[in-house]
């Protein structure tokens, strides 16, 4: 019997190359006893009395941390409901070779007639403050507005009466259900 548990496709979080183009070892190369650099960040939040308050997690590669942090800040600091926190627009900052870029992901807006997620249109339609976008661009940040696959955050929240409330990001195929 092996102790531990499987972390789904975590092997793919290792670097696919063991050395760089100059022959130098890559720190994130697979090796016995190593764990990969990973962005998996399922989070469990407890209240000050140590009781379960909520849990949040999302798919999304190295954007997972931002998705999960956004929901935690939204609920704890801003007092949002689980669904309001899941629906917030996402702002993902990246830097490579000293050059930064910011990707903004549309708020999950569902067309009530077609039940489709609307992902195109002016940034303001998606809950992104156009003044903040303009300010970031004026500072030299490369802003891209994502229309593709984005956050799929799910939240389970414990209400004061002990019942549970769930939320799922409308931008992906997830949903909330109850099993009795």
Model segments located where?
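In a subset of proteins, long, contiguous C-terminal domains/tails are tracked
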Residues: 130-180
